[in-house]
Amino acid sequence: MKDTSKLDAKERIINASIKLFSQKGCDATRVNEIADEAGVTKALIYYYFKSKEEILDHLVQSLLDSAASIAMDFLREIFMQMIKEGQMKMEEGRLRFANQEAVEYFLQSAHKYIEQLLDFALENRAIIRILTLESLKGDKHQSKLFQMLKLGEDAPILKTISQGEGEFYYTDDLKLFLFFFSIIPLVSFAAYFDDYQEISSLSDSEMRSSFVRSVQIVLNSLISESSYLMHNAIKTRP
């Protein structure tokens, strides 16, 4: 039987760290402050984590793993399934659809995915704020932010798509677009959500709806060109 008191203590340590790191940053937060906030001893913190930096690593990696899982679900359940069913294919660096119904289904599914990813980001906005703060310092967590692209040879996203469309690679243009026009807007929206809400007086639902509409406008405009931002962006290897 698990010791629930210890599990609760670890969760309190993590939650206290999230609160303090998001307010002050990791460097400015002392271990004894985490202990006081969590209602535990410093010794218990060191029982679970070697240092406050290890707590930070745990928070960031858990966030990235969960985000990658959401992306992979969309790829497997929608992207790859449509390819297998012949409703969509990649041709000359573009997404081609079999008919208008396929386009509408893809857009509808993509919109649901965007909302799911947005809800995840907002639920974890304190951790995203921490990641943003730490990445600006130029330390290892800057590379963590770039890891969200997952563009290496062993990247699960690339492997998954390659199963249906053959081997291909991302060009520099697509990498830049994905980072600055896809990942960064979502990260920034989550990180500054509370600050913007304070000066705008918008409700949670109003801000969320406005962001979703903005993303949908961009997505719809790309699809209307019969291209999903892949023209001259993703090329088949020779």
Which role does the model predict for each range below?
Residues 12, 112, 130, 177-181:
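Amphipathic alpha-helical interaction segments
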Residues 12, 16-23, 70, 130, ...:
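Solvent-exposed, amphipathic alpha-helical segments
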Residues 108, 112-166, 213, 217:
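Amphipathic alpha-helical packing segments from all-alpha helical-bundle domains
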Residues 12, 16, 20-66, 77:
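Helix-turn-helix
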Residues 1-8, 19, 73-84, 230-238:
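N-terminal intrinsically disordered/low-complexity leader segments
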Residues 59-109:
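Amphipathic alpha-helical linker/stalk segments
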Residues 62, 130-134, 181, 185:
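Short acidic/histidine-centered micro-motifs embedded in hydrophobic/aromatic stretches
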Residues 84, 119, 123, 155-167, ...:
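C-terminal peripheral helix-coil segments that are non-catalytic and often amphipathic
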